[in-house]
Swiss-Prot record:
Annotated transmembrane regions: none
Classification lineage: Bacteria, Pseudomonadati, Thermodesulfobacteriota, Desulfuromonadia, Geobacterales
Function (record text): Attaches a formyl group to the free amino group of methionyl-tRNA(fMet). The formyl group appears to play a dual role in the initiator identity of N-formylmethionyl-tRNA by promoting its recognition by IF2 and preventing the misappropriation of this tRNA by the elongation apparatus.
Any Gene Ontology CC annotation: cytosol
Name of this chain's protein: Methionyl-tRNA formyltransferase
Name of the gene this protein is made from: fmt
Family per similarity comment: Belongs to the Fmt family.
Source species: Geotalea daltonii (strain DSM 22248 / JCM 15807 / FRC-32)
NCBIfam families, sorted: fmt
Domain of life, source organism: Bacteria
Span of the signal peptide: none
Length: 312
């Protein structure tokens, strides 16, 4: 079976590697253009491109996959199936209609929950205790196609998006392999999604990481977990950004956003109905440190206020 693989970030690499290991006929990989990334804004290739080139697979990097010339070049490759994992562009109907076996997407949630761009983040932010991967037939909607196979995993109450990302990328590769086996055996069963059960995982922005201390401790912890490592959570102390990487829930009382303890255990901040202890942080212009180490050299008084940059 002639397969085109479409994907871009690290999350997609285990699935491509699985296709390679299975000796599937991957005739091309389509990924996003090389783009500036990281602190130095160095132009770097997508991880999927690097993996494809290591195995001698032809790579295409269209700025827009929907333009007619690109669609035509894909048609000329005569794929039987297109596999899509975190590609980053919407596929037009003209492209979806090309392969006789359709386009199968590996989506990092238990559909119909968390359709959209950032399911890994939102399932943690919302406090879900279980998530997984769904393989689905793609249609013109946003993650609305028929479901094929699901694999579930529990979410540890202390894990962040990075560890969940790494685990689901492997689960996704296994799910795709099982889906292909069912397809080859003629046993693939399609299941319609129930739109009434859906919710959307919208793309996150840096400003979404500003901590609202008027929330309850569990919600604050879930935000920190769900936004780590990107886009990150933060607050402000005396007008300086304070990045927050890890917290634990406590039972202190005080005005939300007020520092109610600072010591070797961390920086305790009042929320509504309790408190959190910041265990790892980074003040603007300083190194990322365990909070106890940071507080050994930088005094923050009990009663100090955390909040918006312009907060008094």
């Amino acid at each position: 079976m002639r397969i085109i693989f479409m994907g871009t970030p690290e999350f997609a690499c285990p699935t491509l590697q699985k296709l390679i290991d299975r000796k599937e006929e991957v005739v091309a990989v389509i990924t996003q253009p090389d783009r500036p990334r990281g602190r130095g804004q160095q132009t770097l290739p997508p991880p999927v491109k690097v993996l494809a080139e290591q195995h001698g697979i032809p790579v295409m990097q269209p700025v827009k996959v929907r333009v007619p010339e690109v669609v035509e070049s894909i048609r000329e490759l005569a794929p039987d199936l297109i596999v899509v994992v975190a590609f980053g562009q919407i596929l037009p109907k003209s492209l979806l209609d090309i392969p006789p076996y359709g386009c199968i997407n590996v989506h990092a949630s238990l559909l119909p929950r968390w359709r959209g761009a950032a399911p890994l983040n939102w399932c943690i932010i919302d406090g879900d205790t279980e998530t997984g991967v769904t393989t689905m037939m793609m249609d013109v909607g946003l993650d609305t196609g028929d479901m094929l196979l699901k694999k579930t995993t529990s979410i540890d109450p202390d894990e962040n998006t990075q560890s969940l990302h790494d685990r689901l990328s492997i689960i996704g590769a296994d799910a795709l392999a099982e889906t292909l086996d069912l397809l080859n055996a003629g046993k693939l069963v399609r299941e319609k999604q129930d739109d009434a059960l859906t919710c959307y995982a919208s793309m996150l922005k840096k400003e979404d990481g500003l901590i609202d201390w008027s929330r309850d401790p569990r919600s604050v912890k879930n935000l920190v977990r769900g936004m780590t490592p990107w886009p990150g959570t933060y607050t402000f102390l005396d007008g300086k950004m304070l990045k927050v990487y890890r917290v634990r829930i406590a039972e202190g009382e005080g005005e939300p956003g007020t520092v109610i303890g600072a010591g070797r255990q961390g920086l305790e901040v009042a929320c509504t109905g309790g408190s959190v202890i910041i265990e790892e942080l980074q003040l603007e212009g300083k190194k990322r440190l365990p909070a106890g180490d940071f507080l050994a050299g930088y005094k923050i008084a009990t009663g100090a206020k955390l909040g918006h940059k312009d907060a008094a």
